[in-house]
Amino acid sequence: MQVLHVCSEMFPLLKTGGLADVIGALPAAQIADGIDVRVLLPGFPDIRRGIPDAHVVSRRDTFAGKISLLFGHYNGVGVYLIDAPHLYERPGSPYHDTNLYAYTDNVLRFALLGWVGCEMACGLDPFWRPDVVHAHDWHAGLAPAYLAARGRPAKSVFTVHNLAYQGMFYAKHIDDIELPWSFFNMHGLEFNGQISFLKAGLYYADHITAVSPTYAREITEPQFAYGMEGLLRQRHLEGRLSGVLNGVDEKIWSPESDLLLASRYTRDTLEEKAENKRQLQIAMGLKVNDKVPLFAVVSRLTSQKGLDLVLEALPGLLEQGGQLALLGAGDPVLQEGFLAAAAEHPGQVGVQIGYHEAFSHRIMGGADIILVPSRFEPCGLTQLYGLKYGTLPLVRRTGGLADTVSDSSLENLADGIASGFVFEDSNAWSLLRAIRRAFVLWSRPSLWRFVQRQAMAMDFSWQVAAKSYRELYYRLK
């Protein structure tokens, strides 16, 4: 079984979000599981630099200009790169310029990604041809459409990491990207009068996966589906929509071996975690005190992530004696709000605007509770890191958060399945109730330690996801 992942980023070569973490870990787990997996990526500069052994395997003249297909290896995984400097070698992010405007030719840049994914199944590399093309998010959404146009030379899987991003472009570009006009209708890639790369993936793929079972159910409902609920409900009824939970890359996220921590620890040596807390309190300008619970946020500062709720609930958290350490960037209003809180409550609130991968490890190793109060969350990795590090997640019951965290209710404590704190409604009062429950558990140190050990014993390894995908691929054959 040969499988090609088609996507736009891969950790640690290039990362703008959780998609990169998935592609940085899943292929290696699948190779260990016995699948011959390779990855196809655009030749962005950071990716090119990270794979210096890449060599040319094919050259083509395409609708987007002349390209070369390169092949190399990264961490034991075979990686194809689309070498097209006129499309991919630019300042700014992979998707927009330094002024945050989307590149005007994104329709070509990412149509090409899908096209090459399809051409791989048609023999673009004469020595390797995938049985399954596995496309990820809107950037790769046209791969299943091109496969359909070519008579489906391979099976296709499309994974939705976040349905909110739909890859919308003017209808006139259908000629530019060399797809038939017959595809431009509601039973195809048309959405609200435009081309939707996301809908192309959803409509033409043989199977759709979402990154958690709960998110797979949620996206069949109007409040989560962004207008795609009819199609997704149909795919669910056909048995062509399922959820496969993301995993944790234990080579990178493990408190036992994490070199970024001041003190490494296991579930049997949790007392060693205290030194990480002390170091984090010093680094964030907080009062050094191991008797108070240290809450943390590592997130984009957006309303989707529920960070406005944290700001609203913060006075209640501080009144009960808690501390907050925040690392993140995003909405300027939220940034200013948290910076103002830090200025008003020195020693109790510490804020770093920006994102630093290394410092996020130090926060995870030092905090007591990680806050993830998202309004929606397809999977979420932050809470998985929290579980792994014995930093109890406090989450809203949605998407992957609902699948991975069990509330520390009396019943769950008795059954030995409690692993954090869960609240239902997306408002500050509901969040504060969960914060209050965290303080109550904190006041019972032996019970707190019991829940930490439960959380750290949970298995969210990529091997579990790899097995689920292997079973799916073989069902499609």
UniProtKB/Swiss-Prot annotation:
Reaction equation(s) it catalyzes? [(1->4)-alpha-D-glucosyl](n) + ADP-alpha-D-glucose = [(1->4)-alpha-D-glucosyl](n+1) + ADP + H(+)
Q: Which residues are listed for ADP-alpha-D-glucose binding in this entry?
A: 15
One GO-annotated biological process of the protein: glycogen biosynthetic process
- Pathway(s) per entry: Glycan biosynthesis; glycogen biosynthesis
Entry GO terms, CC: cytosol
InterPro entries (alphabetical): Glyco_trans_1, GS/SS, Starch_synth_cat_dom
Q: Mind listing the UniProt keywords for this protein, alphabetically?
A: Glycogen biosynthesis, Glycosyltransferase, Transferase
EC number per UniProt: 2.4.1.21
Record GO terms (molecular function) = alpha-1,4-glucan glucosyltransferase (ADP-glucose donor) activity; alpha-1,4-glucan glucosyltransferase (UDP-glucose donor) activity
Q: Does the keyword Glycosyltransferase apply?
A: yes
* Keyword Glycoprotein in record: no
Q: Which domain of life is it from?
A: Bacteria
Record's family? Answer: Belongs to the glycosyltransferase 1 family. Bacterial/plant glycogen synthase subfamily.
- Record function comment: Synthesizes alpha-1,4-glucan chains using ADP-glucose.
What is this protein's record name? Glycogen synthase
Organism, scientific name: Salmonella arizonae (strain ATCC BAA-731 / CDC346-86 / RSK2980)
What lineage does UniProt assign to this protein's organism?
Bacteria, Pseudomonadati, Pseudomonadota, Gammaproteobacteria, Enterobacterales
